[in-house]
Amino acid sequence: MADHGDLGSDLREQLSQLAAFLSKTDAGEIFRALAGQAQHDPAVAARFASEVVARQRERDRAPFLQARRRGQLAEATDIDLAIDQLVGPVYYRVLVTRQSVPPAFTDALAARYLAQPARGSTAGEPTSGGSR
């Protein structure tokens, strides 16, 4: 992903690319099929998590790490929570409701995240593996 020098621009591009990948590409169709199969097959789930989801998670982290290096994001920001807030609705639309994910939707997700006072900073809350 390109570094646009601005967290908002980077997030809009990342979310737009994710939505297009999941809903408009052959690879996205395979991703959706594997995600479904992973719900029923522990071996597929383990491999899907380690080989596919982990790589996607690193791509999702890129805009935040770039922003942190530029001084646009506080060290205390919970990046994992921010990713969940941003990409969760995209996955939900594609995998659960089968709704389209237009640029206006992904742009609105980025804008809402950026409008949060602490930009996802949640001192003391678990980032993953904790109870929700």
Language model features with spans:
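Amphipathic alpha-helical interaction segments
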Residues: 13, 29-33, 81, 85, ...
